[in-house]
Amino acid sequence: MPRANEIKKGMVLNYNGKLLIVKNIDIQSPSARGAATLYKMRFSDVRTGLKVEERFKGDDIVDTVTLTRRFVDFSYVDGNEYVFMDKEDYTPYTFTKEQIEEELQFIPEGGMPDMQVLTWDGQLLALELPQTVDLEIIETAPGIKGASASSRTKPATMSTGLVIQVPEYLTTGEKIRIHIEECRYMGRAD
């Protein structure tokens, strides 16, 4: 079984009799000598959908669950439900808006490549996105000429409604690459 410092976002733990999907990990390094690094993990309970927060020391042993991953394409929206289709056998997977609220900020209209659903024992658990996504800026302050040498940033609204900080020289209509896990600008899209 892995230690807490080996856990990554998207993994599923069996903790206190609950299946918990790791949504976010904050690493807190203590300044005192000999103190253990703390891992504050935010989870979503698979069965109830409730958010759970737990702290672990880096060398704590945790029980992980092996999941089945299937590549999917976004298919359609039906009211409050989002339907994704398996790329191999065309099995539909349905999520409610609440289940994938965070992920929806990064999914452009028409979907994106390399999305996966995670299942365990035939039970649908989560939607996993690739590391990066290319989105179009639909609203930001006008670009400043000669600002490329500056490291100052400004807020920009993407086509999905996501707001992130981008360099000052970018303008409305440009496509940029965003790192999904860190929710940060990486560069212009190809």
From Swiss-Prot:
GO process annotations (BP): peptide biosynthetic process
HAMAP family documented for this protein: EFP (MF_00646)
GO cellular component, as recorded: cytosol
Family named by the database record: Belongs to the elongation factor P family.
GO molecular function: translation elongation factor activity
NCBIfam families to which the protein is assigned, alphabetical: PRK00529.1, PRK04542.1, yeiP
Protein name (database record): Elongation factor P-like protein
Annotated coiled-coil segments of the chain: none
Gene3D superfamilies noted in UniProt: 2.30.30.30, Nucleic acid-binding proteins
